[in-house]
UniProtKB/Swiss-Prot annotation:
It is found in: Cytoplasm. GO terms for cellular component: cytoplasm. This is Thiopurine S-methyltransferase. HAMAP family: Thiopur_methtran. GO terms for molecular function: thiopurine S-methyltransferase activity. One of its GO terms (biological process) is response to metal ion. It comes from Photobacterium profundum (strain SS9). It comes from the Bacteria.
Length: 213
């Protein structure tokens, strides 16, 4: 993912990927992760997602990583939270109650190991040449026995430029080779879906449970 591209998306408010409500995939499949209240939860490339609030109602330590300071400041402002802000090297850490967001480069922010991960928007934001590096970094942050709830998209990449990019099932299995991988759901969208209306021959959302061995 190009950092300047991401900054410009937020600066120009081109954030069609942002959901105003909690993602139904999260509410439906989070129980499969079997996370306890004290488990440390990581949300990479969290933006200003309201999913953070939902997770914070269930867990004592929810950690986001986000490159855009506009996104981070918007999250806290929109929820009327006043965070404590600490600068550490090239990153800023925003903390309020159960939620901590590291504003900085995903590949270099300093975070203690986590128990569970919710990835709805991070892997699919990565171009193909960055995905192995993204997953390598992610797995380095997850404790042995940790779990990842992963959401990916499957569509003909040649028919639409990303991001979000298509990450097909065989690539998921290759990237997370060595982990226990379970496909929880595949939601094939019909012709009424906006992406299909834009000319895609098919468009599906897949939900995965990745267990780190």
């Amino acid at each position: 993912m190009d950092a300047e591209f991401w900054h410009s998306r937020w600066a120009e408010n081109r954030i069609g990927f942002h959901l105003d409500d909690t993602n139904p995939v999260l509410t439906q499949y989070w129980p499969m992760v079997k996370a306890t209240r004290d488990d440390r939860v990581l949300v990479p490339m969290c933006g200003k997602s309201v999913d953070l609030v939902w997770l914070a109602q269930k867990h004592n330590n929810v950690i986001g990583i986000e490159l855009s300071d506009i996104a981070v400041r918007s999250f806290f402002a929109e929820h009327l939270y006043t965070p404590m802000v600490t600068s550490i090297g090239h990153e800023s850490v925003y903390a309020f109650d159960e939620i901590t967001i590291h504003c900085g480069d995903y590949f270099s922010v300093r975070i203690d190991p986590v128990d569970v991960v919710y990835d709805r928007a991070a892997l699919i934001a990565m171009p193909k040449n960055m995905r192995e590096m993204y997953v390598e970094r992610l797995l380095s942050l997850v404790k042995k026995g940790g779990r990842i709830l992963l959401v990916t998209l499957d569509y003909p990449q040649e028919q639409l430029n990303g991001p979000p990019f298509s990450v097909m099932s065989d690539e998921v299995r290759r990237l997370f080779d060595g982990c226990n991988i379970t496909l929880l759901a595949r939601d094939e969208k019909d012709e009424t879906h906006p992406r299909r209306k834009n000319g895609l021959s098919h468009f599906a959302e897949e939900t995965w449970l990745i267990e780190v061995a």
